[in-house]
Curated annotation (Swiss-Prot):
One of its GO terms (cellular component) is viral tegument. Belongs to the herpesviridae tegument protein VP16 protein family. This is Tegument protein VP16 homolog. GO terms for molecular function: DNA binding. Transcriptional activator of immediate-early (IE) gene products (alpha genes). Acts as a key activator of lytic infection by initiating the lytic program through the assembly of the transcriptional regulatory VP16-induced complex composed of VP16 and two cellular factors, HCFC1 and POU2F1. VP16-induced complex represents a regulatory switch: when it is on, it promotes IE-gene expression and thus lytic infection, and when it is off, it limits IE-gene transcription favoring latent infection. GO terms for biological process: DNA-templated viral transcription; regulation of DNA-templated transcription. Associates with the VP16-induced complex; binding to host HCFC1 activates VP16 for association with the octamer motif-binding host protein POU2F1, to form a multiprotein-DNA complex responsible for activating transcription of the viral immediate early genes. InterPro entries: Alpha_TIF, Alpha_TIF_sf. Keywords: DNA-binding, Host nucleus, Host-virus interaction, Phosphoprotein, Transcription, Transcription regulation, Virion, Virion tegument. Coiled coil: none annotated. It is found in: Virion tegument; Host nucleus.
Length: 454
């Protein structure tokens, strides 16, 4: 029995007809107790106890006042409680893993935020319309907002594993969506403060001289030169925290429930049809002790070691895989970096740019001012685009390479040897096998092979 489960994508967006029939001939002969016993509590982290229950409500500070971009960045870092954020962003300049492009972008949350328009005129108008700066967020911004999906419990029966994986994914996506709704309002508050600071900067540069039209012209010039760059800096910190914090919370809660029920996952066939899904921050199953397939081939231990190295750096629980782990070898190995490949920071930036261009894509307009190309932006149909990196604009490694905006294929999972999939001869039932003495000599070789999936 196999099921195609859409992870971070609608099934209709991708047609995956590949089978999950892979030959790990020793899977059904494994000593389950022996395998699970090797995964001891030494791998547990203090994070597990921190995230053992849902995070409590945490309201954002009042909207920031007009102040310098540096001060706004520092305030945001403190408000999020994310002192390691800047160091993480810097480190991701030297990583190649695509940890973000399989995560949903939630474009619909940004289609009505005019402050994110790629038109300078629209941004300026939205900034002036936002005066005075509000003293509170309405509705309130909860930095620990939760979704409506219930937390999934590890099933007692293997037949329910596929439903469990679906439920784990739905829970994560529900938490992420709920949290991002609040983070988008937080970003808007910082954009307002930044715009008002830039307006004051334009006035100071004119030193009180000039007409209102001269001030407006100067303000638009300052917005064009600085607003997009500074907004992108704030957004990178904000959304990195969103993705990391939600994934940590959900992953460690899943880890706590799965670590004491590992034996059931030996029966699971798990396939990542694209490498970016294996490198993604979120994994619904953390103890993949059954068959594990990456891009049509059995997952190799060195791939597991490399992704676990990154997960450890990000404070995420490691991925365990009993069939491929090698005795006396570490579970982590530092990945090599290539400057010729896209970087992790580029994949994050692509996610952010897609969000921040949503308003202009939904409300197209033609800017009145010529737009210069900046090192932090990319011209798209004459519009100024939000910050990026050179790596994010690189040509793909090959014509067949998976790109961040490509549809995300469904995750493929299957269950090995359940009551429904066990190939029994027509004259046998599970009840008769339990109550009667089974004479294997009366069963043909082909039927025996089918029974034991050989």
């Amino acid at each position: 029995m196999a099921a195609n489960i859409a992870m971070f994508a609608d099934i209709e967006d991708y047609d995956d007809t590949r089978s999950c029939e892979y030959g790990y001939g020793t899977c059904e002969l494994m000593d389950v107790d022996g395998v699970v016993a090797s995964f001891d509590e030494g791998m547990l982290s203090a994070s597990e106890s921190i995230y053992s229950s849902p995070a409590q409500k945490r309201l954002a500070l009042p909207p920031p006042k007009a102040t310098s971009p540096t001060a706004l960045y520092q305030r945001l870092q403190a408000e999020l409680g994310f002192p390691e954020g800047q160091a993480m962003l810097f480190a991701m300049e030297k990583w190649n893993e695509d940890m973000f492009s399989a995560i949903p972008v939630h474009v619909d949350l940004y289609t009505e935020i005019a402050l994110l328009s790629t038109s300078v005129n629209e941004v300026v108008k939205a900034g002036l319309d936002s005066l005075p700066i509000p003293t509170n967020y309405i509705p309130e911004v909860d930095l620990n907002a939760h979704g409506s999906e219930p937390f999934p419990e590890v099933p007692a029966l293997e037949d329910e594993l596929e439903t469990y994986v679906i439920s784990a994914q739905r829970f994560y996506l529900s938490e992420l969506r709920a949290r991002e709704e609040h983070y988008s309002r937080l970003l808007r508050g910082y954009c307002v403060a930044l715009l008002h600071y830039l307006y004051g900067s334009a006035k100071r540069q004119l030193r009180g001289a000039g007409s209102d039209s001269a001030l407006m012209h100067k303000f638009k010039q300052v917005v064009r030169d600085r607003y997009y760059r500074e907004t992108a800096n704030l957004a990178r910190l904000l959304y990195l925290h969103l993705y990391i914090s939600v994934t940590r919370e959900v992953s460690w809660r899943l880890h706590a429930s799965q670590v004491v029920n590992q034996g059931i996952f030996v029966s699971l066939h798990y396939t990542w049809p694209q490498r970016r899904k294996f490198e993604c921050l979120f994994h619904p199953v953390l103890f993949n002790h059954g068959v594990v397939i990456l891009e049509n081939d059995p997952l190799e231990f060195n791939d597991l070691q490399r992704i676990n190295y990154r997960r450890r750096e990000l404070g995420l629980p490691l991925i365990r895989a009993g069939l491929i782990e090698e005795e006396n070898l570490p579970l982590e190995s530092e990945p090599t970096f290539s400057g010729k490949l896209p970087r992790t920071i580029g994949f994050l930036t692509h996610q952010i740019r897609t969000k921040m261009e949503a308003y202009s894509n939904a409300h197209p307009s033609t800017p009145l001012f010529p737009l210069a190309e900046h090192s932090y932006s990319k011209r798209i149909d004459g519009r100024l685009s939000y910050g990026t990196t050179a790596e994010a604009m690189m040509d793909p490694p090959s014509p067949s390479a998976v790109l961040p905006g490509d549809p995300v294929p469904p995750l493929t999972v299957g269950i090995r040897q359940t009551a429904e999939t066990l190939a029994l001869p027509s004259n046998l039932t599970l009840q008769s096998m339990e109550t009667d003495v089974l004479d294997y000599s009366s069963i043909s070789g082909d039927e025996l092979n089918q029974m034991f999936d050989i």
